[in-house]
């Protein structure tokens, strides 16, 4: 089974090397290196590994902005245009690490070749979430050091105080889109990837609607797919409440002090109990003990 891993990275080459070595040998890795980072450091580290494909289209990534979707779609494009056919396109970050062995990962995807591991929730259900996505985040793509950031943030707050809300549905042509949220990490078939990429390339009104939302990378693919009757039933929809474990179906993630926690050996038991394929985030030094425990488990 041929898998394509679509990896976003910006730091910690040592961790990236460790990640790639732990994934199935027959895989191909498509990498986006943040434009702020020196790509030559990454290329030098993988000089002799023909499986590593660095995409030329690089983005100066700003967390929470639409340009996270931009690089994600360019990774999808690179995989679809590659000379070989893949069974799955799997999005991960360079700070992920597989909890499962190479063999377990391949066997998992071989069991159900049609299921799409892309989860979402209709944001109009939980009140707190709907309130967030009714706000205009004009400042999200602005550098915090510039005056534009503060002006646009003040404008967004003024709209909120005036009760001016961003709609949770958008009519584009003869189709009405509802807003769905999930995670930026998913594993999908090339057929579905083509549908999502086509919308990115052709549906400017959809992109404009999502542009001023918080974290469009957690919205774009989900909104495209869950508004498509052909694909909706093949994905994972939760109609009740937002659940981080459900919306990251293959990845263990936990938060600490409003940030994704850098995992260490104290997290090992919870990671194993989650039965997730990956955990994130891990970093050289701080997570070395955890990686050692996972490696020992795989060798038993």
Task: Locate predicted features.
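ER/Golgi luminal nucleotide-sugar-dependent glycosyltransferases, focusing on the catalytic module
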Residues: 1-300
């Amino acid at each position: 089974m041929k898998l394509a891993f679509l990896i976003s990275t910006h730091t910690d080459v040592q961790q990236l090397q460790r990640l790639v070595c732990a994934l199935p040998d027959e895989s191909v890795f498509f990498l986006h290196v943040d434009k702020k980072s020196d790509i030559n450091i990454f290329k030098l580290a993988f000089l002799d590994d023909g499986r590593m494909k660095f995409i030329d289209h690089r983005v100066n990534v700003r967390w929470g902005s639409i340009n996270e979707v931009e690089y994600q779609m360019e990774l999808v494009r690179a995989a679809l245009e590659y000379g070989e056919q893949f069974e799955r396109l799997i999005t991960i970050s360079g700070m992920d690490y597989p909890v499962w062995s190479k063999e377990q990962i391949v066997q998992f995807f071989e069991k159900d070749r049609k299921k799409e591991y892309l989860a979402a929730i209709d944001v109009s259900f939980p009140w707190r979430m709907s309130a967030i996505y009714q706000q205009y985040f004009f400042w999200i793509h602005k550098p915090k050091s510039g005056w534009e950031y503060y002006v646009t943030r003040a404008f967004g707050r003024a709209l909120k105080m005036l009760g001016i809300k961003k709609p949770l549905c958008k009519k584009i042509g003869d189709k009405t889109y509802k807003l769905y949220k999930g995670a930026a990490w998913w594993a999908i078939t090339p057929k579905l990837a083509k549908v999502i990429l086509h919308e990115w390339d052709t549906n400017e009104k959809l992109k404009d609607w999502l542009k001023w939302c918080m974290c469009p990378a957690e919205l774009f693919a989900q909104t495209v797919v869950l508004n498509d009757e052909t694909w909706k039933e093949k994905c994972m929809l939760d109609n009740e409440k937002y659940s981080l474990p459900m919306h990251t179906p293959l990845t263990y993630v936990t938060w600490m002090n409003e940030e994704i926690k850098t995992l260490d050996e104290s997290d090992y038991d919870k990671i194993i109990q989650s039965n997730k394929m990956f955990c994130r985030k891990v970093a050289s030094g701080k997570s070395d003990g955890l990686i050692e425990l996972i490696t020992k488990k795989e060798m038993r």
